[in-house]
Amino acid sequence: MYKTLAALLLLAASTLPAQLQPRRPVVRASGEATVSARPDQVKVSVGVTTQARTAQEAAEQNATITSQVLEALRGLVGQNGELRTTNYSINPMYASTPPTRTITGYQANNTIEVTINNTSLAGRAIDVATTAGATNVVGLRFSLRDPQPVRLQALRQATMQAKTNAEAIATGLGMKVGTVLVAQEGGQVIPFTDMRLAAAGAGASTPIEVGDVDVRASVSIEAELTN
């Protein structure tokens, strides 16, 4: 009879709803890591702005200069780059004298982005574009053609840091880290670039000082605590 009663008690305990069963203590911790790498790709954006009395004249002038800029950039990058138009617009220009707004002409804007798989050509790309007629430099961005290896390295380091933090918490409680129950990436890995324009000498190519691309990762874990 006693054996039967004990078996029934064990069976009843095993069939209790999860919320009624004793909860095991857990520890939650997170870790972050940053891995630096030299960029191997640069995107240079340049703009061509033209103004004329009519929209057609502004567009035609812009098309002529933009064609010259594209031809010059193709000659520089060859098969080692890619060109595309990222923005194009034609807008009226108004006289600033109140009270009426009179159209005085039209302005056409064309933005070209060149992707180059050789970061040392960034300065030359700016020089070539402006010499061919580009009126402004819109932006300069360095990146990695294949960020995956650096991303995985950052994730591994962030995971190790999360585990180290969990062990420190457990030690402070006089316990140990047991089985890891959950491991989750804590957000997007964000590569960004430290880039500065250096001082230029007379007749020199536009100097670009390139910093490393930093890839950041964060990971959070939840693990059991054991005695």
Placement of each model-derived feature along the sequence:
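Short, charge-dense linear interaction motifs
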Residues: 2-227
